[in-house]
Amino acid sequence: MGAECCKQLCRSLHPYAADSLKDSSGRRVDLGTEFSVLTDTSDDEDQVGAGERDDFVQKQLTTPLLSDKNSAIPLTVVTPIQLGANKGGGKRTSSLKSAKNGAGVKKKVRAL
Protein backbone atom coordinates (compact mmCIF):
# COMPACT_ATOMS: atom_id res chain seq x y z
CA MET A 1 0.00 0.00 0.00
CA GLY A 2 2.87 2.39 0.71
CA ALA A 3 4.27 1.95 -2.80
CA GLU A 4 0.87 2.70 -4.35
CA CYS A 5 0.48 5.90 -2.32
CA CYS A 6 3.97 7.01 -3.30
CA LYS A 7 3.29 6.39 -7.00
CA GLN A 8 0.02 8.35 -6.84
CA LEU A 9 1.75 11.29 -5.17
CA CYS A 10 4.63 11.30 -7.66
CA ARG A 11 2.23 11.25 -10.61
CA SER A 12 0.36 14.28 -9.26
CA LEU A 13 3.49 16.48 -8.97
CA HIS A 14 3.57 19.35 -11.43
CA PRO A 15 6.62 19.56 -13.68
CA TYR A 16 6.75 23.39 -13.46
CA ALA A 17 6.88 23.63 -9.65
CA ALA A 18 9.02 21.38 -7.49
CA ASP A 19 7.19 22.22 -4.27
CA SER A 20 3.55 21.79 -5.34
CA LEU A 21 1.09 18.94 -5.85
CA LYS A 22 -2.65 18.42 -6.44
CA ASP A 23 -5.10 17.80 -3.63
CA SER A 24 -8.08 15.43 -3.85
CA SER A 25 -10.19 17.96 -5.75
CA GLY A 26 -7.44 18.64 -8.31
CA ARG A 27 -6.35 22.06 -7.04
CA ARG A 28 -2.66 22.93 -6.83
CA VAL A 29 -1.20 22.92 -3.31
CA ASP A 30 1.90 25.03 -2.79
CA LEU A 31 4.05 23.31 -0.15
CA GLY A 32 6.28 26.36 0.25
CA THR A 33 3.50 28.34 1.95
CA GLU A 34 2.18 25.36 3.90
CA PHE A 35 5.50 24.52 5.56
CA SER A 36 7.12 27.94 5.82
CA VAL A 37 6.94 27.72 9.62
CA LEU A 38 9.20 24.66 9.56
CA THR A 39 11.83 26.34 7.41
CA ASP A 40 12.13 29.52 9.49
CA THR A 41 15.32 29.34 11.53
CA SER A 42 14.97 32.48 13.62
CA ASP A 43 14.27 31.66 17.24
CA ASP A 44 15.34 32.63 20.73
CA GLU A 45 18.68 30.79 20.52
CA ASP A 46 20.08 33.42 18.17
CA GLN A 47 19.39 36.20 20.67
CA VAL A 48 20.77 34.46 23.77
CA GLY A 49 24.53 34.79 24.23
CA ALA A 50 26.68 31.67 24.32
CA GLY A 51 27.85 32.42 27.87
CA GLU A 52 24.29 32.70 29.19
CA ARG A 53 23.28 29.44 27.53
CA ASP A 54 26.31 27.61 28.96
CA ASP A 55 25.56 28.95 32.46
CA PHE A 56 21.97 27.76 32.20
CA VAL A 57 23.00 24.26 31.06
CA GLN A 58 25.60 24.00 33.83
CA LYS A 59 23.03 25.07 36.43
CA GLN A 60 20.55 22.46 35.20
CA LEU A 61 23.18 19.72 35.39
CA THR A 62 24.33 20.58 38.91
CA THR A 63 20.92 21.27 40.49
CA PRO A 64 19.63 18.15 42.29
CA LEU A 65 16.20 16.93 41.27
CA LEU A 66 15.09 16.53 44.88
CA SER A 67 16.66 19.27 46.95
CA ASP A 68 15.10 18.30 50.29
CA LYS A 69 16.26 15.02 51.88
CA ASN A 70 12.77 14.41 53.29
CA SER A 71 11.31 14.36 49.77
CA ALA A 72 13.86 11.84 48.50
CA ILE A 73 12.72 8.33 47.61
CA PRO A 74 13.89 5.78 50.19
CA LEU A 75 16.02 2.95 48.87
CA THR A 76 14.78 0.41 51.45
CA VAL A 77 11.06 -0.11 51.92
CA VAL A 78 9.20 -2.42 54.28
CA THR A 79 6.96 -4.62 52.15
CA PRO A 80 4.63 -7.38 53.42
CA ILE A 81 5.49 -10.72 51.83
CA GLN A 82 3.24 -13.77 52.11
CA LEU A 83 5.10 -16.97 52.89
CA GLY A 84 3.14 -20.11 52.22
CA ALA A 85 3.59 -23.85 51.96
CA ASN A 86 1.74 -26.71 50.29
CA LYS A 87 -0.28 -29.05 52.48
CA GLY A 88 1.30 -32.44 52.91
CA GLY A 89 4.61 -31.38 51.45
CA GLY A 90 6.58 -32.73 54.41
CA LYS A 91 6.60 -29.35 56.12
CA ARG A 92 6.26 -28.76 59.82
CA THR A 93 2.77 -28.04 61.08
CA SER A 94 3.82 -24.64 62.47
CA SER A 95 4.66 -23.41 58.97
CA LEU A 96 1.33 -24.75 57.69
CA LYS A 97 -0.54 -22.89 60.41
CA SER A 98 1.13 -19.59 59.55
CA ALA A 99 0.28 -20.13 55.89
CA LYS A 100 -3.39 -20.80 56.71
CA ASN A 101 -4.11 -17.64 58.68
CA GLY A 102 -2.71 -15.40 55.90
CA ALA A 103 -0.62 -13.11 58.08
CA GLY A 104 2.17 -11.60 56.00
CA VAL A 105 5.70 -11.51 57.28
CA LYS A 106 7.35 -8.08 56.98
CA LYS A 107 10.84 -8.10 55.55
CA LYS A 108 13.01 -5.31 54.25
CA VAL A 109 13.24 -5.32 50.48
CA ARG A 110 15.59 -3.09 48.51
CA ALA A 111 13.81 -1.08 45.84
CA LEU A 112 15.38 -1.15 42.38
Curated annotation (Swiss-Prot):
Q: Which GO terms describe its cellular component?
A: host cell Golgi membrane; host cell plasma membrane; membrane; viral tegument; virion membrane
Keyword annotations of the record? Host cell membrane, Host Golgi apparatus, Host membrane, Lipoprotein, Membrane, Myristate, Palmitate, Phosphoprotein, Virion, Virion tegument
- How does it get modified post-translation? Myristoylation and palmitoylation (probably on one or more of the nearby cysteines at the N-terminus) enable membrane-binding and Golgi apparatus-specific targeting and are essential for efficient packaging.
Q: Which InterPro entries match?
A: Herpes_UL11_megaloV/roseoloV, HSV_CEP3_betahv
Q: Which residues form the lipid moiety-binding region (N-myristoyl glycine)? A: G2
> Would you say which domain of life the source belongs to?
Viruses
The membrane topology term of the UniProt record is: Lipid-anchor
Question: What are the BP-aspect GO terms?
Answer: viral budding from Golgi membrane
Q: What is its main location?
A: virion
Q: Where is this region: Disordered?
A: 84-112
**Do the record's keywords include Signal?**
no
State its location(s): Virion tegument; Virion membrane; Host cell membrane; Host Golgi apparatus membrane
Q: How does it assemble?
A: Interacts with cytoplasmic envelopment protein 2; this interaction is essential for the proper localization of each protein to the assembly complex and thus for the production of infectious virus.
Task: Tell me, in a sentence or two, what this protein's role is.
Answer: Plays an important role in the cytoplasmic envelopment of tegument proteins and capsids during the assembly and egress processes. Also participates in viral entry at the fusion step probably by regulating the core fusion machinery.
Q: Which HAMAP family match?
A: HSV_CEP3_betahv
Give the family, as the similarity comment puts it.
Belongs to the herpesviridae cytoplasmic envelopment protein 3 family.
Q: What is this protein called?
A: Cytoplasmic envelopment protein 3
